[in-house]
């Protein structure tokens, strides 16, 4: 009980006073800001206009969508008004009744805007139409029709592409809020639970991690966000996961693990961020998606394990209880990985009949000594 109170006190009192900076948020967004980018580098974003439009937020995308259509309608409406003005088809020029205008029934800027709208959207009410009197009007009609198709294709395609991006599929992949450290298969492991909320599978799923921390090289150079590979496995391996039910992935804390020299008492004092990646191909669209999350030391629970959430019903179906998805229970766990391996070495030496590996008993033939 006192252990729970101490962990709650440290998390809610001291955790609020010193918020750790995260590179990746819990929902996978990258917390990074680019500064002092020159104008030439910013121009590259306009060269790759398709990716720039796709990456825009919805409010900016809809603003661009509405502005593109209204702007093109107004611009061509102004051009149609200029054509009528130059050809003196407007009522203020008092054209004769037997004169054929470039565009019938354009009486001002409002009617020119309506004709531009009807032309580009292909409404075609029939009251305003182009005659064969002006080659300029015919060319402008062709140009607006082609440009209207391009704008429609680009803007509608951008919205459809943003809706169908696999990024939205990644929202249905969830990770446990906390990672736990406990024994599994006689080894000390760091465990994380991940679940697929859809019945459609991720094909060729691969999971891995990166440990980010500040390190100092022997030459005295400080490397911020130094990355160390963290290998995660499940009981069937880490390639081509059968992601039909929630999985508990684990990282074995051995001599090659960066967690090997950490202990339960010093874990909260560490300064690192564990970023976990899950790559896979969406079964329904064949698009590749990536899911990310991160864990800081306060979110790693030493001496806990996840409670079971998969059970079998009377009808023979397997039921997943997501109410207990992130719940943990306390279990007996060594307070450091080094202690566990030292204990195993001590037991192995005891089985061989000696405690000190440098001291080995050897038999002496006493008959040879007496004969001498």
Curated annotation (Swiss-Prot):
Inhibited by WNK3. Activated by phosphatidylinositol 4,5 biphosphate (PtdIns(4,5)P2). Glycans are attached at residue 98. Its main location: membrane. Residues 109-120, 121-127 dip into the membrane without crossing it. Residues 84-108, 128-136 are extracellular. The chain crosses the membrane at residues 59-83, 137-158. InterPro entries: Ig_E-set, IRK_C, K_chnl_inward-rec_Kir, K_chnl_inward-rec_Kir1.1, K_chnl_inward-rec_Kir_cyto, Kir_TM. Phosphorylation at Ser-25 by SGK1 is necessary for its expression at the cell membrane. Residues 161-188 are annotated as: Polyphosphoinositide (PIP2)-binding. It is a multi-pass membrane protein. ATP binds at residues 204-211. Interacts with SGK1 and SLC9A3R2/NHERF2. This is ATP-sensitive inward rectifier potassium channel 1. It comes from Mus musculus (Mouse). The lineage of its organism: Eukaryota, Metazoa, Chordata, Craniata, Vertebrata. The gene is Kcnj1.
